Amino acid sequence: MIAKIEQLLKEVEALHASNAEELEALRIKYLSKKGAINDLMADFRNVAAEQKKEVGMRLNELKTKAQDKINALKEQFESQDNSCDGLDLTRSAYPIELGTRHPITIVKNEVIDIFARLGFSIAEGPEIEDDWHVFSALNFAEDHPARDMQDTFFIEAHPDVVLRTHTSSVQTRVMETSKPPIRIICPGRVYRNEAISYRAHCFFHQVEALYVDKNVSFTDLKQVLLLFAKEMFGTDTKIRLRPSYFPFTEPSAEMDISCNICGGKGCPFCKHTGWVEILGCGMVDPNVLESNGIDSKVYSGYALGMGIERITNLKYQVKDLRMFSENDTRFLKEFEAAY
Protein backbone atom coordinates (compact mmCIF):
# COMPACT_ATOMS: atom_id res chain seq x y z
CA MET A 1 0.00 0.00 0.00
CA ILE A 2 2.77 2.48 0.97
CA ALA A 3 4.58 1.74 -2.30
CA LYS A 4 1.41 2.47 -4.33
CA ILE A 5 0.87 5.74 -2.43
CA GLU A 6 4.47 6.85 -3.06
CA GLN A 7 4.11 6.05 -6.76
CA LEU A 8 0.90 8.11 -7.02
CA LEU A 9 2.53 11.02 -5.12
CA LYS A 10 5.27 11.16 -7.75
CA GLU A 11 2.66 11.12 -10.53
CA VAL A 12 0.63 13.89 -8.87
CA GLU A 13 3.67 16.14 -8.43
CA ALA A 14 4.44 15.78 -12.15
CA LEU A 15 0.90 16.46 -13.34
CA HIS A 16 0.69 18.72 -16.40
CA ALA A 17 -2.17 19.68 -18.71
CA SER A 18 -2.12 21.65 -21.97
CA ASN A 19 -5.82 22.44 -21.96
CA ALA A 20 -9.04 22.13 -19.97
CA GLU A 21 -9.92 18.75 -21.51
CA GLU A 22 -6.63 17.22 -20.36
CA LEU A 23 -7.14 18.68 -16.90
CA GLU A 24 -10.61 17.12 -16.59
CA ALA A 25 -9.18 13.76 -17.63
CA LEU A 26 -6.57 14.00 -14.86
CA ARG A 27 -9.24 14.87 -12.29
CA ILE A 28 -11.27 11.83 -13.27
CA LYS A 29 -8.17 9.60 -13.22
CA TYR A 30 -7.13 10.56 -9.70
CA LEU A 31 -10.04 12.18 -7.80
CA SER A 32 -13.31 10.74 -9.15
CA LYS A 33 -15.25 7.94 -7.42
CA LYS A 34 -13.60 5.45 -9.75
CA GLY A 35 -10.23 7.18 -9.58
CA ALA A 36 -6.92 5.77 -8.38
CA ILE A 37 -7.00 7.54 -5.00
CA ASN A 38 -10.56 6.39 -4.24
CA ASP A 39 -9.50 2.81 -5.07
CA LEU A 40 -6.77 3.07 -2.44
CA MET A 41 -9.31 4.39 0.06
CA ALA A 42 -11.43 1.27 -0.59
CA ASP A 43 -8.41 -0.97 0.05
CA PHE A 44 -7.63 0.84 3.32
CA ARG A 45 -9.91 -1.61 5.25
CA ASN A 46 -7.51 -4.42 4.42
CA VAL A 47 -4.47 -2.68 5.93
CA ALA A 48 -3.03 -4.25 9.09
CA ALA A 49 -4.05 -2.44 12.30
CA GLU A 50 -0.48 -1.47 13.19
CA GLN A 51 -0.04 0.24 9.77
CA LYS A 52 -3.39 2.04 9.56
CA LYS A 53 -2.13 5.25 11.20
CA GLU A 54 0.83 5.70 8.84
CA VAL A 55 -1.10 4.60 5.75
CA GLY A 56 -4.04 6.85 6.64
CA MET A 57 -1.77 9.90 6.97
CA ARG A 58 -0.10 9.15 3.65
CA LEU A 59 -3.46 8.67 1.92
CA ASN A 60 -4.73 12.01 3.23
CA GLU A 61 -1.50 13.67 2.08
CA LEU A 62 -1.90 12.14 -1.39
CA LYS A 63 -5.51 13.26 -1.73
CA THR A 64 -4.71 16.80 -0.53
CA LYS A 65 -1.76 17.18 -2.91
CA ALA A 66 -3.78 15.84 -5.83
CA GLN A 67 -6.64 18.24 -5.14
CA ASP A 68 -4.25 21.21 -4.73
CA LYS A 69 -2.46 20.33 -7.98
CA ILE A 70 -5.71 20.04 -9.94
CA ASN A 71 -6.98 23.35 -8.46
CA ALA A 72 -3.71 25.12 -9.30
CA LEU A 73 -3.87 23.98 -12.92
CA LYS A 74 -7.53 25.01 -13.10
CA GLU A 75 -6.73 28.54 -11.81
CA GLN A 76 -3.94 28.80 -14.36
CA PHE A 77 -6.32 28.10 -17.25
CA GLU A 78 -8.96 30.48 -15.87
CA SER A 79 -6.45 33.34 -15.61
CA GLN A 80 -5.41 32.78 -19.22
CA ASP A 81 -9.03 32.87 -20.33
CA ASN A 82 -9.67 36.11 -18.40
CA SER A 83 -6.71 37.81 -20.09
CA CYS A 84 -8.53 37.48 -23.41
CA ASP A 85 -11.79 39.03 -22.18
CA GLY A 86 -13.01 41.64 -24.64
CA LEU A 87 -10.65 40.42 -27.37
CA ASP A 88 -12.47 39.89 -30.63
CA LEU A 89 -10.29 37.52 -32.62
CA THR A 90 -12.50 37.91 -35.69
CA ARG A 91 -11.92 41.65 -35.91
CA SER A 92 -9.67 42.93 -38.69
CA ALA A 93 -6.23 44.08 -37.58
CA TYR A 94 -5.50 47.80 -37.40
CA PRO A 95 -3.35 48.98 -40.32
CA ILE A 96 0.30 49.56 -39.46
CA GLU A 97 1.07 53.28 -39.74
CA LEU A 98 4.52 53.73 -41.22
CA GLY A 99 6.45 56.90 -40.46
CA THR A 100 7.98 59.01 -43.21
CA ARG A 101 11.00 61.25 -43.44
CA HIS A 102 10.31 64.95 -43.02
CA PRO A 103 10.62 66.89 -46.31
CA ILE A 104 13.37 69.05 -44.76
CA THR A 105 15.32 65.89 -43.90
CA ILE A 106 14.80 64.48 -47.39
CA VAL A 107 16.18 67.60 -49.08
CA LYS A 108 18.98 68.11 -46.54
CA ASN A 109 20.20 64.55 -47.09
CA GLU A 110 20.06 65.06 -50.84
CA VAL A 111 22.19 68.22 -50.58
CA ILE A 112 24.67 66.45 -48.31
CA ASP A 113 24.89 63.52 -50.71
CA ILE A 114 25.69 65.78 -53.67
CA PHE A 115 28.53 67.54 -51.82
CA ALA A 116 29.79 64.25 -50.35
CA ARG A 117 30.34 63.00 -53.89
CA LEU A 118 32.49 66.10 -54.46
CA GLY A 119 34.71 65.18 -51.50
CA PHE A 120 33.14 67.38 -48.80
CA SER A 121 32.85 66.01 -45.26
CA ILE A 122 30.23 66.97 -42.67
CA ALA A 123 31.11 69.32 -39.81
CA GLU A 124 28.78 70.28 -36.96
CA GLY A 125 28.86 72.77 -34.11
CA PRO A 126 26.80 74.16 -31.22
CA GLU A 127 23.55 76.04 -31.81
CA ILE A 128 24.23 78.24 -28.75
CA GLU A 129 27.32 80.21 -29.74
CA ASP A 130 29.47 83.15 -28.71
CA ASP A 131 29.76 86.47 -30.52
CA TRP A 132 33.25 85.71 -31.79
CA HIS A 133 32.38 82.61 -33.82
CA VAL A 134 29.09 84.02 -35.14
CA PHE A 135 30.17 87.58 -35.96
CA SER A 136 33.69 88.82 -35.13
CA ALA A 137 35.63 85.95 -36.70
CA LEU A 138 33.54 86.39 -39.86
CA ASN A 139 34.44 90.06 -40.38
CA PHE A 140 31.16 91.53 -39.08
CA ALA A 141 31.66 95.16 -38.01
CA GLU A 142 30.65 96.18 -34.49
CA ASP A 143 27.73 98.21 -35.85
CA HIS A 144 26.59 95.63 -38.41
CA PRO A 145 22.75 95.29 -38.48
CA ALA A 146 22.99 91.53 -37.91
CA ARG A 147 24.27 92.24 -34.39
CA ASP A 148 21.09 94.15 -33.60
CA MET A 149 18.63 92.55 -31.18
CA GLN A 150 15.90 92.90 -33.80
CA ASP A 151 17.72 90.30 -35.92
CA THR A 152 19.49 88.02 -33.44
CA PHE A 153 18.51 86.17 -30.24
CA PHE A 154 20.87 87.20 -27.44
CA ILE A 155 21.02 85.74 -23.92
CA GLU A 156 19.96 88.63 -21.67
CA ALA A 157 22.27 87.74 -18.77
CA HIS A 158 25.21 87.06 -21.12
CA PRO A 159 25.12 89.42 -24.14
CA ASP A 160 28.12 87.65 -25.65
CA VAL A 161 26.07 84.43 -26.01
CA VAL A 162 23.69 84.11 -28.97
CA LEU A 163 21.66 81.55 -30.88
CA ARG A 164 23.63 81.13 -34.08
CA THR A 165 22.17 83.00 -37.05
CA HIS A 166 24.02 80.86 -39.62
CA THR A 167 26.12 77.71 -39.69
CA SER A 168 29.14 79.80 -40.71
CA SER A 169 30.08 79.59 -37.03
CA VAL A 170 30.94 75.94 -37.67
CA GLN A 171 33.34 77.05 -40.42
CA THR A 172 35.21 79.33 -38.02
CA ARG A 173 35.57 76.53 -35.47
CA VAL A 174 36.94 74.17 -38.12
CA MET A 175 39.40 76.78 -39.45
CA GLU A 176 40.62 77.43 -35.89
CA THR A 177 41.43 73.78 -35.28
CA SER A 178 42.35 72.45 -38.75
CA LYS A 179 44.98 73.19 -41.33
CA PRO A 180 44.19 73.50 -45.05
CA PRO A 181 43.11 71.84 -47.21
CA ILE A 182 39.63 72.19 -45.68
CA ARG A 183 36.59 70.91 -47.55
CA ILE A 184 33.45 70.78 -45.37
CA ILE A 185 29.69 71.21 -45.40
CA CYS A 186 27.86 72.44 -42.32
CA PRO A 187 24.20 71.40 -42.04
CA GLY A 188 22.14 72.57 -39.08
CA ARG A 189 19.39 74.68 -37.56
CA VAL A 190 19.76 78.45 -37.21
CA TYR A 191 17.74 81.18 -35.52
CA ARG A 192 16.65 84.69 -36.48
CA ASN A 193 14.55 87.17 -34.52
CA GLU A 194 11.83 87.42 -37.16
CA ALA A 195 8.04 87.39 -37.09
CA ILE A 196 6.63 84.03 -38.20
CA SER A 197 4.80 84.21 -41.52
CA TYR A 198 4.30 82.18 -44.68
CA ARG A 199 7.72 83.33 -45.95
CA ALA A 200 9.77 83.71 -42.72
CA HIS A 201 10.32 81.85 -39.46
CA CYS A 202 12.27 82.31 -36.23
CA PHE A 203 14.24 79.14 -36.97
CA PHE A 204 15.13 77.33 -40.16
CA HIS A 205 17.78 75.01 -41.59
CA GLN A 206 20.93 75.78 -43.54
CA VAL A 207 23.68 73.92 -45.33
CA GLU A 208 26.89 75.87 -45.87
CA ALA A 209 30.05 74.75 -47.64
CA LEU A 210 33.67 75.84 -47.24
CA TYR A 211 36.71 74.97 -49.32
CA VAL A 212 40.15 76.35 -48.43
CA ASP A 213 43.34 75.33 -50.21
CA LYS A 214 46.09 76.75 -52.39
CA ASN A 215 45.02 78.35 -55.68
CA VAL A 216 41.26 78.09 -55.13
CA SER A 217 39.51 80.40 -57.58
CA PHE A 218 36.04 81.75 -58.35
CA THR A 219 36.02 79.43 -61.37
CA ASP A 220 36.16 76.46 -58.99
CA LEU A 221 33.20 77.88 -57.07
CA LYS A 222 31.16 78.44 -60.23
CA GLN A 223 31.76 74.89 -61.42
CA VAL A 224 30.63 73.44 -58.08
CA LEU A 225 27.50 75.62 -58.12
CA LEU A 226 26.62 74.52 -61.66
CA LEU A 227 27.05 70.85 -60.81
CA PHE A 228 24.98 71.22 -57.64
CA ALA A 229 22.13 72.96 -59.48
CA LYS A 230 21.97 70.30 -62.18
CA GLU A 231 22.10 67.45 -59.67
CA MET A 232 19.46 69.03 -57.45
CA PHE A 233 17.00 70.44 -59.98
CA GLY A 234 17.72 68.61 -63.23
CA THR A 235 20.26 68.64 -66.03
CA ASP A 236 18.44 71.40 -67.94
CA THR A 237 18.88 73.86 -65.05
CA LYS A 238 20.84 77.03 -65.77
CA ILE A 239 22.49 79.33 -63.24
CA ARG A 240 23.41 82.99 -63.08
CA LEU A 241 25.47 84.91 -60.52
CA ARG A 242 24.62 88.44 -59.42
CA PRO A 243 27.04 90.67 -57.47
CA SER A 244 26.14 90.94 -53.79
CA TYR A 245 27.68 91.72 -50.41
CA PHE A 246 28.50 89.52 -47.40
CA PRO A 247 30.98 90.54 -44.68
CA PHE A 248 32.84 87.22 -44.87
CA THR A 249 33.31 86.89 -48.66
CA GLU A 250 34.86 89.15 -51.31
CA PRO A 251 33.78 89.10 -54.07
CA SER A 252 30.28 87.95 -53.14
CA ALA A 253 27.37 86.80 -55.25
CA GLU A 254 23.78 85.60 -55.17
CA MET A 255 23.04 82.57 -57.30
CA ASP A 256 19.79 82.18 -59.23
CA ILE A 257 18.59 79.13 -61.11
CA SER A 258 16.26 78.98 -64.08
CA CYS A 259 12.74 78.53 -62.72
CA ASN A 260 12.04 74.80 -62.51
CA ILE A 261 8.29 75.41 -62.73
CA CYS A 262 8.10 77.31 -66.01
CA GLY A 263 11.47 76.24 -67.41
CA GLY A 264 12.73 79.84 -67.38
CA LYS A 265 9.88 81.19 -69.50
CA GLY A 266 8.34 83.27 -66.71
CA CYS A 267 5.51 82.51 -64.27
CA PRO A 268 4.01 83.95 -61.05
CA PHE A 269 6.38 81.82 -58.93
CA CYS A 270 9.48 83.46 -60.43
CA LYS A 271 7.68 86.80 -60.80
CA HIS A 272 7.87 86.38 -64.57
CA THR A 273 11.65 86.77 -64.57
CA GLY A 274 12.46 83.15 -65.34
CA TRP A 275 14.93 83.07 -62.43
CA VAL A 276 14.72 82.07 -58.74
CA GLU A 277 17.31 82.93 -56.08
CA ILE A 278 18.55 79.94 -54.06
CA LEU A 279 21.85 80.75 -52.31
CA GLY A 280 24.64 83.17 -51.50
CA CYS A 281 28.33 82.55 -52.15
CA GLY A 282 31.73 84.12 -52.66
CA MET A 283 35.47 83.91 -52.10
CA VAL A 284 36.44 83.84 -48.43
CA ASP A 285 37.58 87.31 -47.34
CA PRO A 286 41.32 87.35 -46.46
CA ASN A 287 40.44 88.97 -43.11
CA VAL A 288 38.37 85.89 -42.21
CA LEU A 289 41.25 83.58 -43.06
CA GLU A 290 43.70 85.63 -40.99
CA SER A 291 41.26 85.86 -38.04
CA ASN A 292 41.16 82.08 -37.95
CA GLY A 293 44.89 81.50 -38.19
CA ILE A 294 45.21 80.80 -41.93
CA ASP A 295 47.77 82.65 -44.05
CA SER A 296 45.73 84.46 -46.73
CA LYS A 297 48.87 84.97 -48.86
CA VAL A 298 49.22 81.21 -49.25
CA TYR A 299 45.64 79.98 -49.14
CA SER A 300 42.34 81.05 -50.64
CA GLY A 301 38.88 79.57 -50.53
CA TYR A 302 35.22 79.86 -51.32
CA ALA A 303 32.07 79.57 -49.22
CA LEU A 304 28.40 79.15 -50.02
CA GLY A 305 25.23 78.82 -48.01
CA MET A 306 21.61 77.94 -48.67
CA GLY A 307 18.37 77.62 -46.72
CA ILE A 308 16.98 74.09 -46.86
CA GLU A 309 13.42 75.36 -46.60
CA ARG A 310 14.04 77.48 -49.69
CA ILE A 311 15.35 74.50 -51.66
CA THR A 312 12.43 72.37 -50.46
CA ASN A 313 9.99 75.07 -51.58
CA LEU A 314 11.47 75.00 -55.06
CA LYS A 315 11.48 71.20 -55.36
CA TYR A 316 7.96 70.61 -54.03
CA GLN A 317 6.24 74.00 -54.56
CA VAL A 318 5.36 74.42 -50.86
CA LYS A 319 4.12 78.00 -50.53
CA ASP A 320 3.97 78.34 -46.71
CA LEU A 321 7.12 77.88 -44.60
CA ARG A 322 5.03 77.28 -41.48
CA MET A 323 3.88 73.93 -42.82
CA PHE A 324 7.37 72.50 -42.26
CA SER A 325 7.13 72.97 -38.46
CA GLU A 326 3.44 72.28 -37.74
CA ASN A 327 3.71 68.45 -37.79
CA ASP A 328 0.51 68.07 -39.79
CA THR A 329 0.53 64.38 -40.77
CA ARG A 330 -1.74 65.06 -43.74
CA PHE A 331 0.98 67.30 -45.19
CA LEU A 332 3.88 65.02 -44.24
CA LYS A 333 2.27 61.92 -45.80
CA GLU A 334 2.49 63.61 -49.19
CA PHE A 335 6.25 62.95 -49.11
CA GLU A 336 6.06 59.17 -48.61
CA ALA A 337 7.26 58.53 -52.16
CA ALA A 338 9.92 61.26 -52.11
CA TYR A 339 12.74 58.92 -51.01
UniProtKB/Swiss-Prot annotation:
Q: Which PROSITE patterns match?
A: AA_TRNA_LIGASE_II
Q: What class of enzyme is it?
A: ligase
Among its keywords, does the record have Nucleotide-binding? yes
Annotated signal sequence is none
Top-rank taxon of the source lineage equals Bacteria
Name the Gene3D superfamilies for this protein: Bira Bifunctional Protein, Domain 2
Cysteine disulfide partners in this protein: none
Q: Which GO terms describe its biological process?
A: phenylalanyl-tRNA aminoacylation
Where is it mostly found? cytoplasm
Q: Which is an annotated GO molecular function term of this record?
A: tRNA binding
| Gene Ontology cellular component terms for the protein in this record | cytoplasm
By its UniProt entry, which Pfam families does this protein fall under?
Phe_tRNA-synt_N, tRNA-synt_2d
Its annotated compartments are: Cytoplasm
Entries under InterPro entries matching the protein? aa-tRNA-synth_II, aa-tRNA-synth_II/BPL/LPL, Phe-tRNA-synth_IIc_asu, Phe-tRNA_ligase_II_N, Phe_tRNA_ligase_alpha1_bac, Phenylalanyl-tRNA_Synthase, tRNA-bd_arm
Please give the catalytic activity noted in the UniProt record: tRNA(Phe) + L-phenylalanine + ATP = L-phenylalanyl-tRNA(Phe) + AMP + diphosphate + H(+)
Give me the residues that bind Mg(2+), please. E250
Kindly list the cofactors needed.
Mg(2+)
Report the co-factor binding details: Binds 2 magnesium ions per tetramer.
EC numbers, comma separated: 6.1.1.20
Q: Which PANTHER family match?
A: PHENYLALANINE--TRNA LIGASE, MITOCHONDRIAL, PHENYLALANYL-TRNA SYNTHETASE
Q: Which family does it belong to?
A: Belongs to the class-II aminoacyl-tRNA synthetase family. Phe-tRNA synthetase alpha subunit type 1 subfamily.
Assembly behavior: Tetramer of two alpha and two beta subunits.
Full protein name: Phenylalanine--tRNA ligase alpha subunit
State the species of origin. Bacteroides thetaiotaomicron (strain ATCC 29148 / DSM 2079 / JCM 5827 / CCUG 10774 / NCTC 10582 / VPI-5482 / E50)
Lineage at the top is:
Bacteria, Pseudomonadati, Bacteroidota, Bacteroidia, Bacteroidales
Q: In the UniProt record, what gene is named as encoding this protein? A: pheS
